[in-house]
Amino acid sequence: MALAVAFASCDDPITRKERSLIDRQYKEGVLTASQSFDFTRWIDVSKGAYRLPSISADEDAKNTYWASASNQGYTMLSSSPTDYPVVPLEENGAAHGAIIRSIKGFYFFGIGTKVIAGALYTGQVDARNLVGKPLESTLFGQPYSSGIPEIVDFTYQYKAGEKVIHGQDKKVELPSEDRAAVSAVFYEVTDDASYLNGVTLQTDARIVAKGYVELEPTTPADTWQTYRLRLTPVDEARYEAVDFTTKKYRLALVFSSSFRGAEYIGAVGSELRLREVKLQDRIKSHH
């Protein structure tokens, strides 16, 4: 009797369906949700200074998952935690998202910029280069091994500031209106373990797949929209050779309030609001 029941349960249609779904999750090419960020938890980087989104209650304030070189660079000018380019989006005293904004800076005798474009990204800040080589101070990427990231869905609002300027008064052609920029870059970690930075983010030879979009102001102004950003292979051979058992990879997610902020070009008052970011991976077999 017991044997008969066992055989019957193995042939049960619901059991077969559940087993099929489980097996499907481990087949190469299947898209699965991997991570999501809602920006409801924030951490004080240091007392009285700025805050950053936190991914766990026990996250180390000196080694956060999210980083912002624009915030760290602004510590010399700010007098309040609410002044920074990246701050929490708060409702009734509780965080419900992130605000990334382009703010007024300081330019004097060739040092600094009149507009500081806010940027929030996964990675670190190299404080040694903040003043002399600011683009190299942004260390983009965090370890990633759940699969090959293919989709980044994010819910956002964006408004552009009134006037686009060059923060160092250079005579260059300027865009008529500011836009936000979002990048997702999946790259291989080579022997030197170096990071992509503001110079190499879009061009480094180690990039496996990437996605990029520029966002115009949302209309109506106060409505939330969801955008689906797809990462496409940059190097087919490197993409096909992805192997999480023998190699290491990082994923860089970069959100900026001014799409040409790295060139000191932007509009004071441009503001990108984020409420949720979700990732989907394409499973890569381990054999």
What is each model feature region?
Residues 12-149, 175-222, 226, 232-259, ...:
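Aromatic (Trp/Tyr/Phe) and Gly/Pro-enriched flexible surface segments
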Residues 149-157:
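Extended, hydrophobic/aromatic-rich amphipathic alpha-helical segments that build helical scaffolds
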Residues 5-9:
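C-terminal motif of bacterial Sec signal peptides marking the signal peptidase cleavage site
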Residues 156-172:
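Short amphipathic, basic-aromatic surface patches that mediate peripheral association
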